[in-house]
Amino acid sequence: MVSIRRYLRVPNELKPSQIFKQDSLSPSKIGLQIVLLQIFYYTTAIVLFYCWAKLAGYDLNIKEWLFSWENIDFTNAYGLSISLLWLLDSLICVFFLTVIVGRSKLAWDFAITIHAINFIVVFLYTRKFPSFSWFFLQILSSLILIFLGTWTTRWRELRDTFFEGLVDPNEGEVGLVTPSQQHSNHSELEQSPIQLKDLESQI
């Protein structure tokens, strides 16, 4: 039973308290962060597509809208609407990037990784090379995640650094005197008259 628990135990770097820590860069943690961001990226898109289909009166076709590049077209309202929803998805994912990653130096890497995985998924689903319109949309979406994600994560880093500087780790220790310190102070007071007498004898 003990051995089974040992295998079922979650590694320390994969615990929720460690996933969102900024000072850990273990491969397992980075891999989990990529998976979480990809899940939120597609989940947000599904919610946006569902709301848009209900409001605009379109038949809901999640698989085609998510994993196909053929719907991305800038020459009609239908294709433009889907493109704008993808850009809105990237804008919302800036928040998830800030919370999950939280490091400005890694925002660029994670933004590119999300869209690289999306390209692989789309290519495997359609078995065709995407169009120029789709690639242009991915570039715009990547720029949103890179620039806004870098700005928000840097703001978070500066905020954490500012508040850490205001907290004194030694606060609360002032005024506390240990018994050993009391004994040393008492011995110093006892030795001071002797030193004064020695000075008087020398004079």
Swiss-Prot record:
Superkingdom of origin: Eukaryota
Transmembrane segments annotated in the record for this chain: 30-52, 79-101, 106-125, 132-154
Cellular location(s): Golgi apparatus membrane
GO terms for biological process, alphabetical: Golgi to endosome transport; Golgi to plasma membrane protein transport; protein localization to Golgi apparatus
Numbered residues of crosslink Glycyl lysine isopeptide (Lys-Gly) (interchain with G-Cter in ubiquitin): 15
Keyword Phosphoprotein: yes
Pfam families: SYS1
Gene Ontology, cellular component aspect: cytosol; Golgi membrane; trans-Golgi network
Keyword field: Golgi apparatus, Isopeptide bond, Membrane, Phosphoprotein, Protein transport, Transmembrane, Transmembrane helix, Transport, Ubl conjugation
InterPro entries according to UniProt: Integral_membrane_SYS1-rel
Lumenal topological domain: 53-78, 126-131
Membrane topology of the entry: Multi-pass membrane protein
Disulfide bonds: none
Cytoplasmic side: 1-29, 102-105, 155-203
Modified sites of kind Phosphoserine: 192
Miscellaneous: Present with 238 molecules/cell in log phase SD medium.
Role played: Necessary for the targeting of ARL3 to the Golgi. Involved in protein trafficking. May serve as a receptor for acetylated ARL3.
Family: Belongs to the SYS1 family.
Record's protein name: Protein SYS1
Organism from which the protein derives: Saccharomyces cerevisiae (strain ATCC 204508 / S288c)
Origin organism lineage: Eukaryota, Fungi, Dikarya, Ascomycota, Saccharomycotina
